[in-house]
Amino acid sequence: MSFPKNFLWGAASAAYQIEGAYDEDGKVPGIWDALSRGHVKHGENGNIACDHYHRYKEDVALLKKLGVKAYRLSVSWPRVMSGPDTVNPKGLEFYSNLVDELKAAGIEPMVTIFHWNLPMWAYEKGGW
């Protein structure tokens, strides 16, 4: 099987599964922080995960080394929205820096706006 010359090879991730930094820089609890506690084998959770929040530059360098041309990421709304009317500047800064790093590496960022990562405050109000 061959792929068209313009086929875009990429990789993907989900914020909760890779970012870690679960209580840093203004991130508030999300539904996965609550739902995964005590329900995953060996008590695993996303507190540290792959530590992408702190290691995103290394991760992007690895993607570039692999020849990845596109990267689909998701937004952690608990990192971006600390309350109903409160945007977390540090959360926005993280995603801005990540997108800049991807672009500098020649990797096309593709953002999934919602990948089931709802802040607990929104869940407790019945959702968005």
Question: Where is each model-derived feature located?
Answer:
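Substrate-binding cleft and catalytic face of glycoside hydrolase catalytic domains
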Residues: 60-128
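N-terminal carbohydrate-binding accessory modules
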Residues: 1-66
